């Protein structure tokens, strides 16, 4: 289920103070958070960026192997994005496009990789639930918070990504929108 929330993704706090929040965003496979919402993730969660960049560099021989996967990273308690007194945020890097800029993939390819990345995230969250308390709805759906992924620098019409996200009925997806 998708719920639209007007406001800043980075002010989100879980309903239970002991629960972990999941913040997801679409990423390239080249280790760059240099534009769009990724730059805000970089400022808020520098420890997660380092892990992401290092992970991408270990796949530098063929970064496209990361497409359709998700890297789920626990941020550091010292990251500025954890200032709201909440539990540590987990950053989900959805590898939806190999490159960025003019070399980004087509909207159809990005949508297909989003579907695969979300399936991978869903699997990882099921495992993580066995070890940690993750923010969930009263119906038991894990809450995933995100901006309108792919709609910025990857230039995918939102309706295409929205159709993909609507397939994940077992997840409660908060999509943050800013005017």
UniProtKB/Swiss-Prot annotation:
Entry annotated with the keyword Glycoprotein: no
Top-rank EC class of the record's enzyme: hydrolase
Cystine connections: none
GO molecular function, one term: ADP-ribosyl-[dinitrogen reductase] hydrolase activity
Catalytic activity: ADP-alpha-D-ribose 1''-phosphate + H2O = ADP-D-ribose + phosphate
Keyword field: Hydrolase, Protein phosphatase
Keyword NAD: no
EC number: 3.1.3.84
Domain Macro: 1-179
Stored Pfam families: Macro
Binding of substrate, residues: 7-9, 26-28, 33-38, 149-155
One Gene Ontology biological process: peptidyl-glutamate ADP-deribosylation
Functional note: Highly specific phosphatase involved in the metabolism of ADP-ribose 1''-phosphate (Appr1p) which is produced as a consequence of tRNA splicing.
Family, as annotated: Belongs to the POA1 family.
Name of the featured protein: ADP-ribose 1''-phosphate phosphatase
Upper classification of the organism: Eukaryota, Fungi, Dikarya, Ascomycota, Saccharomycotina
Gene (UniProt): POA1
């Amino acid at each position: 289920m998708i719920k639209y929330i007007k406001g800043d993704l980075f002010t989100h706090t879980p309903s239970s103070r002991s629960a972990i929040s999941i913040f997801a965003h679409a990423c390239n496979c080249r280790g760059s958070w240099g534009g769009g919402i990724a730059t805000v993730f970089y400022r808020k969660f520098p420890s997660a960026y380092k892990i992401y960049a290092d992970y991408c560099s270990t796949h530098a021989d063929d970064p496209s192997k990361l497409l359709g996967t998700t890297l789920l990273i626990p941020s550091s308690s010292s990251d500025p994005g954890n200032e709201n007194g909440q539990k540590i945020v987990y950053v989900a890097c959805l590898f939806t496009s190999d490159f960025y800029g003019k070399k980004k993939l087509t909207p159809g390819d990005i949508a297909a990789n989003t579907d695969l990345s979300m399936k991978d995230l869903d699997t990882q969250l099921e495992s993580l639930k066995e070890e940690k308390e993750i923010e969930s709805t009263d119906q038991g759906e894990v809450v995933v918070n995100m901006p309108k992924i792919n709609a910025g620098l990857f230039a995918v019409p939102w309706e295409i990504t929205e159709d993909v996200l609507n397939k994940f009925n077992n997840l409660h997806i908060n999509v943050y929108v800013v005017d």
